[in-house]
Amino acid sequence: MLKFEARPQASLFWRYASPLLALLITVVLGIGLFVLLGKDPVRGLQMFFWEPLKSAYALGELMVKATPLLLIALGLAVCFRSNVWNIGAEGQFVMGAVAAGGVALLADKDTGRWVVLAILLAGVLGGMFWAGITAWLKDKFHANEILVSLMLVYVADMVLSYLVYGPWKDPAGYNFPQTKTFEAVTQIPRLMTGSRVSVGILLALLCVAAVWVFLFRTRLGFAQQVGGLAPAASRYAGFSSRQSLWLALMVSGGFAGLAGALEVAGPIGQLNPYVPAGYGFAAIIVAYVGRLHPVGMVFSAVLLSMFFIGGELAQSRMGLPKSITGVFQGLLLFSLLACDTLVANQLRWQGRRA
């Protein structure tokens, strides 16, 4: 019979092969799901893995989706490596969007292009403020950061709804819950004509390099990771757990807020109730599929972007519910968790005893 046996040390091979095996299992389970739903599995897989790549416009949309996923995942990786469990990046994303939207609404057509920087800064500060609530409650009252950050997601959604249904509602918007469309001067510069992709993707890649340097080439980044991997050793070395907590959540909140600012000042162009698209939760999967490594998360962000686009296409072309995106994300996450058992364990055949 097959039996799991602990490895003497974690397998480096399976650490990086596990996400690939998890993706393969997700594809196989996805085929089974399409068959159960009475849909052509080949066409279903085409929606998820070919359509998002087949044209320049499709690649542009892929980058539009990947930008917020990558930025949020970078911040979450810093948190998770620091043993700080920020599950509320979605709320920080929303509050970053709200803060950025507030600045954008103050601009008029005569405002200078400097307002774009002000919008991005407001987004960063909005996300940091929302993450700071979690950090303060954890630091002051030892509140569980998982529950606090998660509950604050719903508070952020309510703040957004209040604003777009109330004081920020566009009087000329036919009673739709949305702000007026932001002035053209507030828009993030586009990379390609005829596409929604903006310079935000370049900013995200710059942040990848910055996080890599921070984590692997600075003493502060080393201290963050020691605090996460070995808290006792961290205290013995004199590293501050309070500093680690605040820094992790401020970085994570700042990246999530920046993602929110890029979203509302880019492809959306206004505030509405549909700003919360689930990027904050999907970025958790991005972070773990990418092994909490900045470069790995570039590839996992692209993969999860394909799931978002594939879900939209499956809904419009195959009549499947929009929740198919979440189903594929869940399949990937649980497959990864299952495959990760091979990192610390190995399968051995154990014969029956006489």
Predicted regions and their residues:
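Interfacial/capping segments of alpha-helical transmembrane domains
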Residues: 31-52, 167-179
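Helix-loop-helix "hairpin" substructures at the membrane interface of multi-pass membrane proteins
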Residues: 192-270, 294-295, 299
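Alpha-helical transmembrane segments of multi-pass membrane proteins, especially transporters
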Residues: 15, 19, 61, 65, ...
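Transmembrane alpha-helical segments in multi-pass inner-membrane proteins
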Residues: 250-330
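Cytosolic-side transmembrane-helix boundaries in multi-pass membrane proteins
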Residues: 1-25, 31-35, 229, 236-243, ...
